[in-house]
């Protein structure tokens, strides 16, 4: 059951049908609907807890829906709410499996999944759904993140999802294609850089993600897009500077400006290869006057503006 009561906001009825906002456009997921964007919440921060982070991201989906609700709606694709997948019992693996099943279901119905996390453990569940829905496609993972999230650990955490994806690729004979944009040398040990090299990952440091470097970044991005059939885009909001995104477990001391992230994410959305996207690590407990919620909602809104199905 989808709780649609959360989708409320300003109504500009005097300005006519073209004055809609998201809360007036989002529908509960229908059994049969025109291809659109399916919003899925992953109300989970069990991975963050296991990774010794600051919990609270389980409240992200609800807060981000509220932030999206009042944004102006410019018609591109239908918007659907496919409800939440929660992890209330600490069983992260089961929650990730349920998320994967939900993602696969919305893809089978012709929609593009937009997942609102939740910690970055969201990524492995999202991957399970994408890989099941596209078994024969070369799926590339593009991660905007200050961290590689390639940790080796005895149990899954918010720091292990891409190591898990690499292992899943190995089990199923897939090539692990991973591009991480915004990596902070201060936040990743040499061991993590060594792991990234061993797995054949590509990356770009946060210090090489400035606006004046966009031409070079776009070139690297274009090469990666050319090498894959489909893209899984994941935006860890801690890639943004702390001044723009305070509402995360690990705020960035440097970070990548939101204008750069938006421009590059928009290019990915317009490529025609986007198979699924998520925004993760938003923690409303640490937000300041909704600054973080508004920044995250802006990125989700921007993706929707660039998509065509």
Swiss-Prot record:
So which domain of life are we looking at? Bacteria
| Positions contributing to Mn(2+) 1 binding | 120, 145, 149, 236
InterPro entries hit by this protein: HutG, Ureohydrolase, Ureohydrolase_dom_sf, Ureohydrolase_Mn_BS
Q: Among its keywords, does the record have Protein biosynthesis?
A: no
Which pathway does the database say it acts in?
Amino-acid degradation; L-histidine degradation into L-glutamate; L-glutamate from N-formimidoyl-L-glutamate (hydrolase route): step 1/1
Query: GO terms for molecular function, please?
Result: agmatinase activity; formimidoylglutamase activity; manganese ion binding
Record-listed Mn(2+) 2 binding positions = 145, 147, 236, 238
Record-given protein name: Formimidoylglutamase
Q: Which organism is it from?
A: Chromobacterium violaceum (strain ATCC 12472 / DSM 30191 / JCM 1249 / CCUG 213 / NBRC 12614 / NCIMB 9131 / NCTC 9757 / MK)
């Amino acid at each position: 059951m989808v709780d649609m009561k959360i989708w409320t906001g300003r109504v500009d009825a005097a300005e006519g049908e073209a004055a809609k906002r998201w809360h007036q456009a989002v529908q509960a997921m229908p059994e049969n609907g025109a291809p659109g964007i399916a919003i899925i919440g992953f109300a989970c921060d069990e991975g963050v807890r296991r990774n010794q982070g600051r919990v609270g991201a389980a409240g992200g989906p609800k807060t981000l829906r509220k932030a999206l609700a009042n944004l102006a709606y410019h018609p591109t694709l239908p918007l659907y709410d496919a409800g939440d997948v929660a992890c209330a019992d600490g069983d992260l693996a089961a929650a990730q499996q349920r998320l994967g099943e939900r993602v696969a279901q919305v893809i089978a119905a012709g929609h593009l999944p937009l997942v609102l996390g939740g910690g970055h453990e969201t990524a492995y569940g999202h991957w399970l759904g994408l890989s099941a829905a596209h078994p024969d496609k070369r799926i590339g993972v593009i991660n905007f993140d200050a961290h590689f999230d390639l940790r080796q650990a005895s149990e899954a955490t918010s720091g292990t999802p891409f190591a898990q994806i690499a292992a899943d690729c190995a089990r199923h004979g897939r090539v692990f294609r991973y591009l991480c944009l915004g990596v902070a040398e201060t936040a990743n040990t040499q061991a993590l850089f060594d792991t990234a090299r061993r797995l054949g990952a590509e990356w770009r440091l946060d210090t090489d993600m400035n606006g004046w470097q966009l031409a070079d970044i776009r070139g690297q991005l274009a090469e990666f897009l050319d090498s894959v059939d489909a893209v899984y885009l994941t935006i860890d909001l801690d890639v943004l500077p702390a001044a723009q995104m305070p509402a995360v477990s690990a705020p960035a001391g440097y970070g990548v400006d939101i204008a750069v992230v938006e421009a590059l994410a928009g290019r990915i959305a317009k490529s025609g290869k986007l198979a699924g996207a998520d925004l993760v690590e938003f923690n409303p407990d640490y937000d300041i006057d909704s600054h973080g919620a508004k920044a995250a909602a802006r990125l989700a809104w921007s993706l929707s503006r660039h998509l065509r199905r």
